[in-house]
Amino acid sequence: MAYYWIAAAVVILDQWTKWLVVRYMQLGESIPIIDNVLYITSHRNRGAAWGMLEGQFWLFYLITVIVVAAIVIYIRRLKPSERLAGVGLGLMLGGAIGNFLDRVFRKEVVDFIHAYIGTYSFPVFNVADSALTVGVILLFVHMFFFATPEKGNE
């Protein structure tokens, strides 16, 4: 149950921060947080990561519903000792739902976190994207370092 609370917290934080950006910033406006490193930039994305597959809403709806269902099934099958995987899945669930809500209600995803790594301008992203990324990393860490292989029928 705690993993669903993590997902809910991600969705609330994601939607609140997006609302703030839409409400108080002009599209394209950028506010420096740390010069040459981190900015809040009002941006919209009608595709997937980095603008891929722009305008393919039904594909995104279908994929998201399948992913959310798979995450919920996986969470239900977790053992109590698999907390790291559960946290990762909770983050992934919240991130998937956060961006799904944007696609359904706005027909675009609000992005606003703009980071620079040296001279490289990283694509603008949001809280949901961050949660998805961290969730995937945690799931991989769990799988590679903590998961025990299932014993087959011998």
From Swiss-Prot:
Q: Where are the transmembrane segments?
A: 55-75, 85-105, 127-147
Q: Which GO terms describe its biological process?
A: proteolysis
Q: Which domain of life is it from?
A: Bacteria
Q: Does the keyword Transmembrane helix apply?
A: yes
> Which keywords has UniProt assigned to this entry?
Aspartyl protease, Cell membrane, Hydrolase, Membrane, Protease, Transmembrane, Transmembrane helix
Q: List the Gene Ontology MF annotations in alphabetical order.
A: aspartic-type endopeptidase activity
Q: Which family does it belong to?
A: Belongs to the peptidase A8 family.
Q: Which NCBIfam families match?
A: lspA
What is this protein called in UniProt? Lipoprotein signal peptidase
Instruction: Identify the species of origin.
Output: Geobacillus kaustophilus (strain HTA426)
Q: Which gene encodes it?
A: lspA
